[in-house]
């Protein structure tokens, strides 16, 4: 995980958002909407939402794309979190890793799974379907493509749409990790 504690681009405090900016971000991802109500008694806005508020049109589009993958995808929640956490670890994104630990646990990943996600190699501790998912994540991070052998193994478990979903999910979270790492967004940042 990156060790830089300096934020190059701090989240925009919710008190500074216009109603138009809030409206652009709202309605794209149900998980995010609870933070976008503008209600003073609402939950604290996570730093990533404040970051997206700095460019609401791009932030809203990002939330919409994420919503399609997270809320309308066909992968099991556990598999989705497995992939996201692997990307978080492999890209050294402290924010991504820390934000998805609880989600991964809620989705069924146990402490041994979470520790194994930090291993540099994918071992037989994972059942075959998970092993192929992790291999896809590793190959996309390392090589920006999936090998024929991994593709073939993945197709034993997933249909075409699910394979595309895996590719888009990993790719989108690699992109997000690059943004988070570059701007210096870390879990301990507060609004």
Go through each PLM region and give its residues:
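C-terminal end-helix/capping segment
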Residues: 103-113, 117, 179-191
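A contiguous pocket-lining binding segment that forms or flanks enzyme active sites
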Residues: 107-136
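Acidic, carboxylate-rich catalytic segments that either coordinate divalent cations
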Residues: 153-155, 162, 171-175, 179-191
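Conserved alpha-helical segments that form or flank metal/cofactor-binding pockets of metalloenzymes
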Residues: 60, 81, 87-107, 111
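Acidic/histidine-rich alpha-helical segments that form the ligand environment
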Residues: 127-157, 161-167
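Short alpha-helical scaffolding segments that buttress acidic/His motifs in well-ordered protein cores
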Residues: 49-52, 62-69, 82-88, 117-118, ...
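Secretory/endomembrane lumenal or extracellular ectodomains immediately following the signal peptide
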Residues: 1-77
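Alpha-helical scaffolds flanking conserved acidic
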Residues: 75-83, 161-165
């Amino acid at each position: 995980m990156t060790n830089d504690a300096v934020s190059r681009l701090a989240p925009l405090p919710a008190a500074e958002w216009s109603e138009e900016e809030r409206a652009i971000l709202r309605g794209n991802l149900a998980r995010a909407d609870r933070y976008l109500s503008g209600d003073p008694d609402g939950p604290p806005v996570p730093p990533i939402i404040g970051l997206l508020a700095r460019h609401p049109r791009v932030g809203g589009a990002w939330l919409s794309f994420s919503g399609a993958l997270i809320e309308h995808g066909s992968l099991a929640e556990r598999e989705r979190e497995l992939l996201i956490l692997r990307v978080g670890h492999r890209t050294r994104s402290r924010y991504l890793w820390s934000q998805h630990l609880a989600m991964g646990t809620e989705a069924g990943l146990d402490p041994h799974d979470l520790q194994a996600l930090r291993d540099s190699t994918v071992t037989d501790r994972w059942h075959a379907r998970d092993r192929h998912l992790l291999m896809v994540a590793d190959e996309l991070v390392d090589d920006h493509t999936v090998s024929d052998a991994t593709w073939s193994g993945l197709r034993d478990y997933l249909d075409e749409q699910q394979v595309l979903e895996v590719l888009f999910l990993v790719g989108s979270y690699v992109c997000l990790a690059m943004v988070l790492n570059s701007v210096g967004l870390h879990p301990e940042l507060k609004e």
